């Protein structure tokens, strides 16, 4: 029992120093605050999913991508995908493309 309390105190101290110790708790200034933030964020997404149903929620995500594809046209959407596919945790797709000499035609990104 004491070890669990000590662990919570350690996590709380890290949270007070600005570290995220609970997934989804980004921005919380204490362990408890991060727990509440994470719970609220999770519940927010789930509430929307419950309102729309699983199919509707999936369709909403699909529609967002389709709308963007229609705005940019097929070529622009594919070009953006190429750039996004090059990104890593420490470098953006644009940085990697530049380093590796891969041409990305950003003029195709323009909304029609």
UniProtKB/Swiss-Prot annotation:
Polar residues bias: start-end ranges: 44-53
Expression is induced as follows: Down-regulated by drought in 30 days after fertilization seeds. Not regulated by drought in leaves, cotyledons, hypocotyls and roots.
* Superkingdom of origin organism: Eukaryota
The record, for PROSITE patterns, names: SMALL_HYDR_PLANT_SEED (PS00431)
GO BP annotations listed = response to abscisic acid
Q: Where is this region: Disordered?
A: 1-112
Compositional bias of kind Basic and acidic residues: 7-17, 32-42, 56-82
Which body tissues produce this protein? In seeds, expressed in the embryonic axis and in the cotyledons. Not detected in leaves, stems or roots.
Q: Which InterPro entries match?
A: LEA_5 (IPR038956), Sm_Hydphi_plant_seed_CS (IPR022377), Small_hydrophilic_seed_prot (IPR000389)
PANTHER family this protein is in?
Answer: EM-LIKE PROTEIN GEA1
| Family in the record | Belongs to the small hydrophilic plant seed protein family.
What protein name does the entry list?
Protein SLE1
Q: Which organism is it from?
A: Glycine max (Soybean)
